[in-house]
């Protein structure tokens, strides 16, 4: 009985709700790689040293030590690349798609998944202009500051989730800057 009570208490503390799709991945790809008519997925399997370097830079290690970049082309011309990044929060995971121009700047950001609990916060943050604050960022440049950018126009929980999106964008910038050129065709 004591074990059952402890399990219930832990479950109450870890009140993670189901994940919902806010934007389907194919729709995010089309939005972030406009005009592309061909796509390729490229995996980068990180060595222990590379994984440690990424973890030190942005406190993150990709699942199974593998980064996946999606490139888009229109004919023979590169349209850009994107990466889907998962951010684990106390309220459950969110997934952020970060698209890059061929010049390496952030083209756009789309929050593709969140938990049922966080969905209204994400929608409020996006409505307050969150994703506009990431355009033009480059690896090694300014840190993502979307949360600070919407602080005066959104509630505390929307600003909180914006900070989590900032983490996802920072992780994508670090991964793209350090590893994308090694796999570009």
Question: Where are the model-predicted features located?
Answer:
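Intrinsically disordered terminal and processing segments
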Residues: 2-95, 101-185
């Amino acid at each position: 009985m004591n074990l059952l009570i402890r399990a219930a208490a832990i479950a109450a503390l870890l009140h993670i709700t189901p994940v919902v799709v806010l934007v389907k991945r194919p729709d995010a790809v089309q939005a972030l790689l406009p005009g592309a008519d061909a796509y390729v997925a490229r995996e980068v399997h990180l060595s222990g040293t590379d994984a440690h370097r990424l973890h030190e830079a942005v406190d993150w290690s990709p699942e199974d030590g593998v980064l996946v970049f999606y490139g888009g082309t229109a004919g023979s011309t590169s349209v850009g690349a994107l990466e889907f990044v998962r951010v684990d929060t106390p309220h459950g995971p969110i997934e952020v798609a970060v698209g890059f121009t061929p010049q390496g700047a952030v083209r756009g950001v789309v929050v593709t998944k969140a938990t049922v609990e966080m969905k209204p916060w994400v929608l409020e943050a996006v409505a307050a202009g969150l994703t506009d604050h990431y355009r033009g960022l480059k690896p090694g440049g300014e840190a993502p500051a979307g949360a600070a950018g919407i602080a005066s126009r959104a509630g505390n929980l929307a600003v909180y989730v914006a900070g989590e999106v900032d983490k996802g964008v920072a992780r994508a910038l670090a991964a793209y800057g350090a590893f994308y050129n090694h796999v570009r065709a």
